[in-house]
């Protein structure tokens, strides 16, 4: 039995708890470019108070540079997950299952691979080839503990318990969200499935509209289901992220992943081009997300807020250190009969001073390179 004094104590404690909760400061909404330059197809994972991210690395090796952060804004490199390969790597997915870290990734050969590690700092395993087609893999653990890999066009493939092989054939379970026909896009192109569970719902976050078309092409679309395999219900607030006009600061916003922090704040991480600066590639951006009363994510601020640029800034001077396993993270290196050193431009304009010491009979040069069809420079 509760006497009068105990009841007053309980009620006072509840009142203090209610006031404390009401006065707890909310996190400042984020609307920030955290990786300026060409850091496309971001995938992000939270493990306690730590965040890990990697991006498409294409033809540059060592590949899949893994980054670490504790505040989602400032990032440090900690490992490269793939040492070498004869293919291009793009649109990976990083996840953690039963204490082990996984990165699933597709290649230009139409194949999907996975690498694993006990710690995100590595060492990472040799790539394991999966009998899974498609691109843009997205891993999910279902309510019964079974593992699945989603790929583009709404397909899902069951995996073995260790996540290292397909356990069945792909099945189409999602048709995407039909955006208005009058929108100017590159095509429908349902891709980039990223999945997570919140409460009783599984959420499927995808990209549509094409990533390199007109400024208004790309978008982030959300669907949900009580099952990891659907059926999927599209959000009435779609698209979560989209460029509506060529006048906006960022073009072709898309390829998003939703992530929370330990305090319960939610964010969407995605990529986009700077207005009229396709040459800088697709930067990685983060924005704050809030939840509606009926459990749909929406942006905290859709328009009007000033964009901030944090992340990878500072001195880009470089002295080659062959003993550094990361090869200084702002640079990539390749080895043939010589050495290729590359870095990503993050500014609208810049100056480059290069000093070479070349042995007799050798050659050196400096190039601006976007892809195999767009580059110029000089060597001698």
Please tell me what each predicted stretch does.
Residues 2-11:
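Bacterial N-terminal signal peptides that target proteins for export
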Residues 63-66, 112-116, 155, 219-221, ...:
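A short loop-to-beta-strand structural motif that recurs across blades of beta-propeller domains
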Residues 295-380:
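Extracellular glycan-recognition regions
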Residues 69, 117-118, 159, 225-226:
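Conserved Ser/Thr-centered positions that define the repeating blades of beta-propeller domains
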């Amino acid at each position: 039995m509760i006497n009068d004094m105990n009841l007053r104590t309980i009620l006072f404690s509840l009142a203090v708890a209610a006031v404390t909760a009401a006065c707890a400061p909310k996190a400042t909404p984020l609307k920030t470019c955290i990786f300026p330059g060409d850091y496309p197809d971001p995938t992000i994972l939270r493990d306690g108070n730590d965040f890990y991210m990697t991006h498409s690395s294409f033809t540059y090796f060592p590949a899949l540079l893994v980054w670490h952060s504790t505040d989602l804004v400032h990032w440090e490199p900690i490992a490269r997950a793939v040492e070498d390969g004869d293919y291009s790597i793009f649109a990976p997915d990083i996840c953690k299952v039963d204490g082990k870290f996984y990165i699933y990734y597709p290649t230009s050969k139409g194949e999907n691979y996975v690498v694993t590690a006990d710690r995100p700092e590595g060492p990472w395993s040799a790539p394991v080839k999966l009998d899974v087609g498609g691109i843009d893999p997205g891993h999910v653990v279902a309510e019964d503990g079974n593992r699945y890999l989603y790929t583009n066009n709404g397909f899902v493939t069951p995996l073995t318990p260790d996540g290292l092989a397909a356990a069945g054939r792909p099945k189409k379970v999602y048709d995407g969200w039909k955006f208005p026909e009058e929108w100017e896009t590159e095509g429908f192109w349902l891709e980039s499935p990223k999945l997570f569970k919140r409460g009783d719902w599984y959420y499927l976050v995808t990209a549509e509209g094409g990533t390199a078309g007109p400024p208004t092409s790309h978008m982030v679309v959300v669907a949900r289901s009580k099952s990891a395999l659907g059926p999927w219900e599209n959000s009435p607030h779609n698209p979560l992220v989209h460029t509506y006009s060529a006048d906006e600061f960022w073009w072709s916003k898309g390829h998003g992943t939703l992530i929370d922090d330990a305090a319960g704040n939610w964010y969407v991480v995605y990529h986009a081009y700077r207005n009229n600066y396709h040459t800088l590639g697709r930067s990685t951006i983060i924005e704050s997300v809030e939840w509606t009363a009926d459990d749909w994510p929406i942006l905290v601020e859709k328009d009007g807020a000033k964009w901030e640029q944090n992340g990878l800034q500072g001195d880009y001077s470089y002295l080659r250190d062959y003993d550094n396993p990361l090869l200084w993270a702002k640079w990539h290196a390749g080895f043939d009969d010589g050495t290729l050193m590359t870095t990503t431009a993050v500014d609208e304009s810049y100056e480059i001073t290069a000093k070479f010491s070349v042995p007799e009979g050798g050659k050196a040069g400096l190039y601006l390179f976007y892809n195999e069809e767009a580059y110029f420079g000089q060597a001698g």
